[in-house]
Amino acid sequence: MKIPVLPAVVLLSLLALHSAQGASLGSSEEETTIGNYAAGPEAFNAQFLNIDKLRSAFKPDEFLNWHALFESIKRKLPFLNWDALPKLKGLRSATPDAQ
C-alpha cells in the first residue's frame, strides 16, 4: 500500500499547529470521569476526523503535479500568509537550477 508522503506531512504539520495554538491559548482541561471518558472517542472522531473531507482535499491525480497540489493546499488553507513562503519557480523548469 502506497501512502502519499506530502499530504501526510501536511496533515501532521496542521495537527501540530493546531495543538500548539490550543496550548498557547491555555485551554482548561475537564476532569476525567467515567461518563465523559466513555463518550470521549466517539465525540473526538466525529469532531476532528472527517475522512471523506480529507480524501476530497487530496485527489490522486494531483500528487505528481506540484503546482496543482500547492494550489489545492492554498485553497484549503486561505488563512495562511502564502506570500511569506518561497515561490515554486524551480519546479516549473525541466532543467535543474544552476548551483
Curated annotation (Swiss-Prot):
Location of this chain's protein in the cell: Secreted
Domain of life: Eukaryota
Main location: secreted
Signal peptide boundaries: 1-22
Disulfide bonds: none
Keywords carried by this UniProt record: Differentiation, Secreted, Signal
Tissue specificity annotation: Highly expressed in skin, but not detectable in any other tissue examined. Expression restricted to cornified/stratified epithelia and not detected in non-cornified/stratified epithelia.
Keyword Secreted assigned: yes
A single BP term in Gene Ontology: epidermis development
Gene Ontology cellular component terms for the protein in this record: extracellular space
InterPro entries in the record: KRTDAP (IPR028196)
Keyword Nucleus: no
Physiological role: May act as a soluble regulator of keratinocyte differentiation. May play an important role in embryonic skin morphogenesis.
Name the UniProt record assigns to this protein: Keratinocyte differentiation-associated protein
Chain's gene name: KRTDAP
